[in-house]
């Protein structure tokens, strides 16, 4: 099957572990989920035939859960527990680790300068964003008022883009979240944590942008 003309967001939802494959190639399937596989491959200089073959292999596996068929209230409950609560735990710990690494290794050329500042900005951005979702948007959707939520959803999507831009900056200052040879245990653990946080955030944004919001606006 040809996947090149399909949007990344759709492929991430319909093919098991496609999201992990896209992360491997640094393809944005959440905020950039509307771009086709062909366009994303061209932007990242990836051989389209190779990634299509990899997706075909993944597509042979059974999909764990098709969120496109799950009730919206259940999706919202899953988002809050699986992602909102997790981000609230992850980011303060990562900020503490970044503060330590930047202080202890200040003289090292590969130290991720500014990482604490950018993680703090992301934490503040997401804290405000998630509170607005939980207090305003999610109750509207649960009450069947998704069609009237065009304004709040537009704001949330814009804030998703802003969070994605901060993630790009974090990836830049950490050399794509790759620890250098001299990295200590804390440094390596922090980068593992950052990768986990980015994975969770991309899954979170993808589920909202590509499933929850379109279905809510359609009046489900």
From Swiss-Prot:
Self-association state and partner proteins as the record states: Homodimer.
Intracellular or extracellular location(s): Cytoplasm
Annotated InterPro entries: FeS-repair_YftE, Hemerythrin-like, RIC_family
Keywords noted in UniProt: Cytoplasm, Iron, Metal-binding, Stress response
Keyword Repeat: no
Functional note: Di-iron-containing protein involved in the repair of iron-sulfur clusters damaged by oxidative and nitrosative stress conditions.
Lineage: Bacteria, Pseudomonadati, Pseudomonadota, Gammaproteobacteria, Enterobacterales
UniProt keyword DNA repair, yes or no: no
Gene Ontology cellular component terms for the protein in this record: cytoplasm
Organism: Salmonella typhi
One Gene Ontology term from the biological process aspect of the record: response to nitrosative stress
Similarity remark: Belongs to the RIC family. YtfE subfamily.
GO terms of molecular function: metal ion binding
HAMAP family: RIC_YtfE (MF_01606)
Name of the protein this chain belongs to: Iron-sulfur cluster repair protein YtfE
């Amino acid at each position: 099957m040809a996947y090149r003309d399909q949007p990344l967001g759709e492929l991430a939802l319909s093919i098991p572990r496609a999201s992990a494959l896209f992360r491997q190639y640094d393809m944005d399937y959440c905020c950039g989920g509307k771009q086709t596989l062909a366009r994303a491959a061209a932007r990242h200089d990836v051989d389209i035939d190779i990634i299509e073959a990899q997706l075909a292999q993944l597509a042979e596996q059974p999909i764990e859960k098709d969120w496109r068929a799950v009730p919206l209230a259940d999706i919202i409950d899953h988002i809050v527990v699986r992602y909102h609560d997790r981000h609230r735990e992850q980011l303060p710990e990562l900020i503490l680790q970044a503060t330590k690494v930047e202080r202890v290794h200040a003289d090292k050329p590969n130290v991720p300068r500014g990482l604490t500042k950018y993680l703090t900005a992301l934490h503040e951005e997401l804290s405000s964003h998630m509170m607005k979702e939980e207090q305003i948007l999610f109750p509207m959707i649960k009450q069947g008022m998704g069609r009237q939520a065009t304004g709040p959803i537009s704001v949330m999507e814009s804030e998703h883009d802003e969070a994605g831009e901060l993630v790009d900056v974090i990836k830049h200052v950490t050399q794509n979240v790759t620890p250098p040879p001299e990295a200590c245990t804390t440094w390596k653990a922090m980068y593992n944590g950052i990768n986990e946080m980015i994975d969770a955030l991309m899954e979170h944004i993808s589920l909202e942008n590509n499933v929850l919001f379109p279905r809510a606006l359609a009046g489900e």
